[in-house]
Curated annotation (Swiss-Prot):
Organism, scientific name: Homo sapiens
Annotated S-S bridges: C95-C187
Protein's name according to its UniProt entry: Olfactory receptor 5B17
Glycan attachment points: N3
Extracellular-facing ranges: 1-23, 74-97, 159-194, 257-269
GO molecular function (one): odorant binding
Positions of transmembrane segments: 24-44, 53-73, 98-118, 138-158, 195-215, 236-256, 270-290
Any GO BP annotation: G protein-coupled receptor signaling pathway
Family: Belongs to the G-protein coupled receptor 1 family.
Keyword field: Cell membrane, Disulfide bond, G-protein coupled receptor, Glycoprotein, Membrane, Olfaction, Receptor, Sensory transduction, Transducer, Transmembrane, Transmembrane helix
PANTHER family found in the cross-reference section: OLFACTORY RECEPTOR (PTHR48018)
Keyword hit for Transmembrane helix: yes
Localization: Cell membrane
GO cellular component, one term: plasma membrane
Length: 314
């Protein structure tokens, strides 16, 4: 499809224009990004190294960590560059690439969360058939499906956005190339693009959320039938971390994308975007390890092995 754009680059306004906030924000977001990389890479490595964590739940969790690294890395380095040297320009192709990878990994996380909900349903509601239900092939198909849908969704969104002509302002009132902020700059008819954004985002979010809610409804029914008092707290606690992650992710995504353009506020969008592109990827490994004895035990084993290796060297 022909692209009639006359814009070769965009200008990202960033989070703030106040000079006194540039350095504090740079330090804060650098720490957040380092914690995100360390936590998520650590989670992936831990799952790979410990055979006790080679289960469907941790397989999906490792992919969730990968998705968190993906969309955090698509956004944060450019934000840090803008804060440090005030380089707010982003090329046309870099803007498209940033939007593409954000859409890919956000969609992947969306469907991974529903896959994890189905996994918890199989573990709690059909424990005797769990190993035959969540086979390696099933897990691989679910994970591959998440990535395929992610790339398909991103391709549609990018193709729809960058077919438009940008012949007016090139100043994006955001800190990254997010579709709602970019399409406001077009001099083409944008109602179709806005409709595509809302419809596809709504389908992705609510379909995955429906699978998640149905899974947890059956989990709740099963727990209430089989356990009373303290008995049902243990199986329910295995789902607690997942429910927290679901709540944090979907609240911000719904605020960002499943609203008509007339109700968008750039300041609200920036706050929500900081939360889901930087804060949630940082919190994810913390949320999943706080009450998880398996991960804690695996971590202690790695620490003990590292200490033993150091002692043997010195």
């Amino acid at each position: 499809m022909e692209n009639n754009t006359e814009v070769s680059e965009f200008i990202l306004l960033g989070l703030t224009n106040a000079p006194e906030l540039q350095v504090p924000l740079f330090i804060m977001f650098t720490l957040i990004y380092l914690i995100t990389l360390t936590g998520n890479l650590g989670m992936i490595i831990l799952i790979l190294l410990d055979s006790h964590l080679h289960t469907p739940m941790y397989f999906f969790l490792s992919n969730l960590s990968l998705a968190g690294i993906g969309y955090s890395s698509a956004v944060t380095p450019k934000v840090l560059t803008g804060l440090l040297i005030e380089d707010k320009a982003i090329s046309y192709s870099a803007c498209a690439a940033q939007m593409f990878f954000c859409a890919v990994f956000a969609t992947v996380e969306n469907y991974l969360l529903s896959s994890m909900a189905y996994d918890r349903y199989a573990a709690v509601c059909n424990p005797l058939h769990y190993t035959t239900t969540m086979t390696t092939r099933v897990c691989a198909c679910l994970a591959i499906g998440c990535y395929v849908i992610g790339f398909l969704n991103a391709s549609i969104q990018i193709g729809d956005t960058f077919r438009l002509s940008f012949c007016m302002s090139n100043v994006i009132h955001h800190f990254f190339c997010d579709k709602p902020a970019v399409i406001t700059l077009t001099c083409s008819e944008k109602h179709i693009s806005e409709l595509i954004l809302v419809l596809i985002s709504s389908f992705n979010v609510f379909f995955a959320l429906l699978v998640t809610l149905i899974s947890y409804l059956f989990i709740l029914i099963t727990i209430l039938k089989r356990h009373t008092g303290k008995g049902y707290q243990k199986p329910l606690s295995t789902c607690g971390s997942h429910l927290i992650a679901i709540f944090l992710f979907y609240i911000t995504v719904i605020i960002m994308y499943i609203r008509p353009s007339s109700s968008h506020s750039m300041d609200t969008d920036k706050i929500a975007s900081v939360f889901y592109t930087m804060i949630i990827p940082m919190l994810s490994p913390i949320v999943y390890t706080l009450r998880n004895k398996d991960v804690k035990n695996a971590f202690m084993k790695v620490v003990e092995k590292a200490k033993y290796s150091l002692d043997s060297v010195f």
